[in-house]
Amino acid sequence: MASALRRLVEQQQWRYLVSQSTRSPKLIHGFFSFSSKTNPNPNKQQQILIDYISKSLQSNDTWETLSTKFSSIDLSDSLIETILLRFKNPETAKQALSFFHWSSHTRNLRHGIKSYALTIHILVKARLLIDARALIESSLLNSPPDSDLVDSLLDTYEISSSTPLVFDLLVQCYAKIRYLELGFDVFKRLCDCGFTLSVITLNTLIHYSSKSKIDDLVWRIYECAIDKRIYPNEITIRIMIQVLCKEGRLKEVVDLLDRICGKRCLPSVIVNTSLVFRVLEEMRIEESMSLLKRLLMKNMVVDTIGYSIVVYAKAKEGDLVSARKVFDEMLQRGFSANSFVYTVFVRVCCEKGDVKEAERLLSEMEESGVSPYDETFNCLIGGFARFGWEEKGLEYCEVMVTRGLMPSCSAFNEMVKSVSKIENVNRANEILTKSIDKGFVPDEHTYSHLIRGFIEGNDIDQALKLFYEMEYRKMSPGFEVFRSLIVGLCTCGKVEAGEKYLKIMKKRLIEPNADIYDALIKAFQKIGDKTNADRVYNEMISVR
């Protein structure tokens, strides 16, 4: 009898609320109006309405029944949020989802970002992950630009008694809809807020970044993960190895580690070493050392690599004294010297012009049983060439070729550029021939420097041979090659040949300069051909 009476009273109160809503909305304006804030202290009328809707949902009323009962009610944001929180427990999460969709579809209501956040929290806690992902994606794709789902999820995290998994799903959804930079920003922000995201989230973010060919972003994400103590698994490492392959850097890193360790390293060591060197190359020395320390603590790189990287970092900063101290400590602790570390010292000495010290280090290196490699010799060749030791540069280039190593194109070009004596030009040309037979690929600058050297040494025939060798190799001679040839031909009295190459030059749309015209004019004047000298002069004036 008492329960029947209580139901009758509630029905009468409900009829009163509905009639008031229909006749005079202003009387309950604070309840039914749209509001972005949840009312923390709903009045009695509001409470009755909330209770009534909640009971209907608990009874699993159909959408049609709900629409019939509440057709005249104006659902505010605060009302929706309060009702959703009534169903925040896992066992009632489906009612929360039903109410969210009913209010959206039947009432044609555009939910606020806070309603989305509350519903997502409730669904994740109940492990209704497919529905949660769908709502996250819908919110990210359809919400106004000024709405921030991250803020709303953080603001409603405690009140909804949620779980950190919600933030993993959020970042994963950002990745899947290709909002990759935004997803990374959210990833960093959540880590800064104290949430530890899962390695699955890390893998999802780097996987989609890699598929989108944003390799730089992949490395930034991986670096951030290590910094925030989110450590990779086998899948992470597999993705990162694929990225190294796509970048064409895998062999480079593997070779580097072979020189440091003398043996092949695990894929995880390859990836982590590559990360530290990448950060170092960006001159972020402090960050690289912090990363290295963390990797060493987790045994994600070996000590030999750690010491070698620290030596490299100190040398990169120009602090050779500290670099040498670290190297000595490395040896004292029983680690072997390696070709990479020695080459670091050789490079710095060559850059500073202390080529004799670089040569001494090479001797020390070989006496220690450590074999120099191509980069060691490239540094020496470039150093000797830059600082006027052309014979020494040629000597080390010959040593390289004899040992079956190949000079880099840049080092070879620097050496050829420095030679001045004709005998050294011939020597350089012989080295080029041997190197080409072994697979060396010269560029235009290689031929340009040699052609200039032969012309300055009055060997025009050899210069012309190199010109036609360029043509045979499908290399297009540039301005410097034509300038050297034409000026050289004119200087040795072959003005007709000089004019022939001027015509070829212009036919290839390469503009001659004043030096070329002056050489032709002087050559014609020298043989008394005033007519052609005037013609070339007039042409020079017209093109200016």
UniProtKB/Swiss-Prot annotation:
PPR repeats lie at residues 163-197, 198-232, 233-267, 268-302, 303-337, 338-372, 373-407, 408-442, 443-477, 478-512, 513-544. InterPro entries: Pentatricopeptide_rpt, TPR-like_helical_dom_sf. It is found in: Mitochondrion. Residues 1-116 form a transit peptide. Gene3D superfamilies: Tetratricopeptide repeat domain. GO terms for biological process: Group II intron splicing; mitochondrial respiratory chain complex I assembly; mitochondrial RNA processing. One of its GO terms (cellular component) is mitochondrion. Keywords: Mitochondrion, Repeat, Transit peptide. Its main location: mitochondrion. It holds the Pfam family PPR. NCBIfam families: PPR (TIGR00756). Belongs to the PPR family. P subfamily. This is Pentatricopeptide repeat-containing protein At1g66345, mitochondrial.
